[in-house]
Amino acid sequence: FTYAVQNGDSLISVGAQFGEDVAALAALNELKPSARLKPGQELHVDNRHIVLHVIDDGIVINVPQRMLFYFHSGKLLAGFPVGLGKRTWQTMLGDFEVSEKEKDKTWIVPESIQEEMVAKGKPLKKRVPPGPNNPLGKHWIRISPSCGIHGTNAPTSIYRFQTHGCIRLKPEDIASLFEKVPVGAAVEIVYEPVLLARLPDGKLYLEVHPDIYRKAGDPLAAVNQMAAAAGVESMIDWQKVNEVIKERRGLAQEVGLPVESILKGNR
């Protein structure tokens, strides 16, 4: 789709808004990642993502994909781009549960972050009251003693790895999720940089992300394994697969062979 640039927009802010990597957004529009945007300028945006459906009820967060999905009764109700932990301060993986929801939460600054403030020469803060300077934003969803899903006062940090492990959403997205998700809901945080999907019409899509935490193996081996499990090896354009792996744009890209090629191969 196309997006009309607003005052104050940058490639970073547009990418954060829609869940598209800055490099991919720049390449799609034949721009440099550092390019300045003009109000009214039209940008092509491609934020197609493969939905990782691993539970029927609750929240699924795929770290390399930087996406959060909320399911209820097997149906996808919402999908949002998120900001996650930097490589040196990683977002935890595993099974969690929503234990608390709170609006306008005072941020009690963890000692580890206080130490980081001092090391970087920043003013030391132990508590940050609700308001525009609170990095938690207006909504807080606790999923562990030390981790939560929350808003932000820095919207351009969304769809990037810049947090101390928590999961950030845009203010309007966390407000929507806050109303939908109940206390007790399941939360699964997974690490899947390679995703393969077959749509009802038979088309095959591959989505490959950088291995930001260096936890994954060979992406081509992962695609081979998924394709074999789905029985679609002969339907895949493996040259295209290699291109998608090399680029790692983090977008769902079609990798299926034309029907004629498949039929010819089956003769």
How would you label these PLM feature ranges?
Residues 15-22, 155-165:
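Short, basic/aromatic beta-hairpin or loop at an interaction surface
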Residues 163-178:
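Short beta-strand-centered segments at strand-helix junctions
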Residues 180-196:
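A short beta-strand-loop micro-motif that forms or neighbors metal/cofactor-
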Residues 8, 40-43, 184-187:
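Loop/turn positions that initiate beta-strands
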Residues 1-19:
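Primarily a LysM-type cell-wall glycan-binding module
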